[in-house]
UniProtKB/Swiss-Prot annotation:
The record marks 170 as: Important in determining the strength and specificity of the interaction with its subsrate. It comes from the Eukaryota. Belongs to the protease inhibitor I3 (leguminous Kunitz-type inhibitor) family. This is Kunitz type trypsin inhibitor 104. InterPro entries: Kunitz_inhibitor_STI-like_sf, Prot_inh_Kunz-lg. GO terms for biological process: arbuscular mycorrhizal association; response to symbiotic fungus. It is found in: Secreted; Secreted, Extracellular space, Apoplast. It comes from Medicago truncatula.
Length: 201
């Protein structure tokens, strides 16, 4: 093989590797397209038997509302949008492993934000619940989640690990899963992870 052919061969493989790596940095929806921060999506369990899409669920009182899954299998739930902590001014694709806000696109009688937020520990399981509302603490790190790739292509986990929103904070990161309590499917950290997919509205 000539030096020129070898150079072209190597450059072609480097380009292919860079293109594959670049695509892998983005969250992909159920249609195979990158998830965008200015679009609406439904978050659905990737595995049947976990309930329907993500939705607002009442807890012990009317407010704050919890983040959960619809009890009816196959339902879409409530649409969300994603707002990156550090948006890329040149594109609107949602990136893997980057802090972002998740916001339900609906109004509530609670008169509060529908941003996902890390809540208190569940009294029974000790797992940290996901609720809605603004975190009024310094840096609002309770409102920042991230999407991470699972080992199965096209499925993802959602984690609370706000290392961009608060790089100096010492936090106990956790992956979102489900607690079944009083006939409700509540999202919480610190247990079995819930693999999800993102379906564009």
């Amino acid at each position: 093989m000539s030096t020129r052919s070898l150079t072209i061969f190597i450059l072609a493989h480097v380009w292919l590797l860079m293109a594959t790596t670049s695509i892998a940095q983005f969250v992909i929806d159920t249609s195979g397209e990158p998830v965008e921060d200015d679009e609406e999506y439904f978050i659905r369990p990737a595995i049947t038997g976990n309930g329907g899409g993500s939705t607002l669920v009442t807890g012990n009182g009317p407010c704050p509302l919890h983040v959960g899954l619809d009890n009816t299998e196959g339902t879409l739930g409530v649409a969300v949008k994603f707002t990156p902590f550090a948006p890329q001014h040149d594109d609107d694709d949602v990136r893997l492993n980057r802090d972002l806000r998740v916001t339900f696109l609906t109004s509530t009688s609670c008169g509060q934000s529908t941003d996902w937020r890390l809540g208190e520990k569940d009294a029974t399981s000790g797992r940290r619940l996901i609720v809605t509302g603004r975190d009024n603490g310094a840096g609002s790190q309770g409102n920042f989640f991230r999407i991470v790739q699972t080992q199965t292509g096209g499925t993802y986990n959602i984690q609370w690990c706000p290392t961009e929103a608060c790089p100096s904070c010492k936090v106990q990161c956790g992956t979102v899963g489900v607690i079944r309590e009083n006939g409700k499917n509540l999202l919480a950290l610190d247990g079995d992870a819930l693999p999800v997919v993102f379906q564009k509205e």
